[in-house]
């Protein structure tokens, strides 16, 4: 499985689940194979805050970048196990595969190799920042009654609609 250390605090935004889903999609595994460790100031990376959709965009991009690094690292380690060069292998469906020979090793085998008699641990860290926060799209509508003589405004109805885009969680 994969361990995901994040600095975002899940305050009802669902970021733990969203980021685990993003890792699972990038690493081509089940979300059940992802353990999320978040908001531990002794161990977690810095995060500017968990609010609106910014965690999905900003921290999610960092997760994607870390997955890209990890795949390359896993390909290097997997190539050692397969006795070939990293250029000869690909990351496919959670395995390191040599398409020319059809041989493959699992992510679990790569993880074990990285921890036993190896000078390279299978781990990756990435950061991502954005100069602007992604804008939310929202509209609010109000129906009022106006007494033109007194200026009294009475709110009869109010509706707000937020476009969340494509829901991830």
PLM features: residue spans?
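Cofactor-binding beta-sheet edge motifs in enzyme active sites
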Residues: 1-169
